Amino acid sequence: MTKPIVAIVGKPNVGKSTIFNRVVGERISIVEDTPGVTRDRIYSSGEWLTHEFNIIDTGGIEIGDAPFQTQIRAQAEIAIEEADVIIFMVNVREGLTQSDEMVAQMLYKSKKPVVLAVNKVDNLEMRNDIYDFYSLGFGDPYPISGSHGLGLGDLLDAVVENFNKESEDPYDEDTIRLSIIGRPNVGKSSLVNAILGEERVIVSNVAGTTRDAIDTEYSYDGQDYVLIDTAGMRKKGKVYESTEKYSVLRALKAIERSEVVLVVIDAEQGIIEQDKRVAGYAHEEGKAIVIVVNKWDTVEKDSKTMKKFTDDVRNEFQFLDYAQIAFVSAKEGLRLKTLFPYINQASENHKKRVQSSTLNEVVTDAISMNPTPTDKGRRLNVFYTTQVAIEPPTFVVFVNDVELMHFSYRRYLENQIRNAFGFEGTPIHIIPRKRN
């Protein structure tokens, strides 16, 4: 299921970031256990009344044609385009301004649900000053105080009321849902076209469950696939591509609806920080992943080139040590057939279940080879392990004290489970839980 996207927009200094932080709370904290995943995002997850959503902060929009302002306005337009609901924030202390009216004009054109939030209403007397904002034409303004947290519940009530009910997944459970992600200009569109080209049977273009996404169904070697949001991957435009933090919103929607994600990198340019950031989105969503090294035809090669590049990928993507690596040239159509066994294996392992008896034998043997750690004289005791979920495979380990299960030992158990059962292409989650 795809989480709705909520965008906070408005002129500078109306308190957008304060409200953003209020909504996401502690969800923006850094997870230390995941090396290599950069976290300088302007979006995070929020939840209200059992509704989960992604929320994004945008730069302040002002009147003017300075290059910096032009870029901020372009970024905000992208955020508005990708959002399902928009929080339009204004500042009661400044009153209604030309910048507010300019933002309102942008929002009229979007035809998206807009919830008007009047910030910095820090006391009851200031509520009398919100009525000027009715003229913006977005219905009742919601008075809030970001600094004090006042009125936030009513605001979020209005936001979630605008969420559309999710459509059911229209695809058969045996159909592999696939998305292609990567930073700009790594050849995503070329890979889409190559996959859908010769020897592939395109079944149909169907509307996806996400607004204005087009999914493409196709078959290869007896297996059905659906490529999520081919329209989004083919989308062009320098402004859209240059604003990476905002254009990633569409990729997030595709990732959430996917089972297997192809992370595309450029063999010619090598691996940069942005590649790791893009891959991190899919990893954190628990998706099966195949790393695709594209433009392999542009690299001068000898007998050791592929081994060296593989080592570089493993070093840079340490958090994706489970992902298979495919070397292809989408433009030339080279080595594309190597992709599909990796995709199929990743999908199969993403849904794999293992027997509890065999699983516990593996864990017992692992503990015999490497005894559980101690801390201040107390030893970690592992009582029982069971698989509780698939997509991704998730295991609960019942222990005497969760604090004694350090990350390094959890990773050790994960590696032993992988060695025993495979799980190539998919993350697996190990969750320690105190036995009652």
From Swiss-Prot:
Oligomer and partners: Associates with the 50S ribosomal subunit.
Keywords from the UniProt entry: GTP-binding, Nucleotide-binding, Repeat, Ribosome biogenesis
PROSITE patterns according to UniProt: G_ENGA (PS51712)
Alphabetized Pfam families for the sequence: KH_dom-like, MMR_HSR1
Gene: der
Name under which the protein is recorded: GTPase Der
Domain KH-like: 352-436
GO biological process, one term: ribosome biogenesis
InterPro entries: G_ENGA, GTP-bd, GTPase_Der, KH_dom-like, KH_dom-like_a/b, P-loop_NTPase, Small_GTP-bd
Domain of life: Bacteria
Organism (species): Staphylococcus epidermidis (strain ATCC 35984 / DSM 28319 / BCRC 17069 / CCUG 31568 / BM 3577 / RP62A)
GO molecular function: GTP binding; ribosome binding
Coiled coil: none
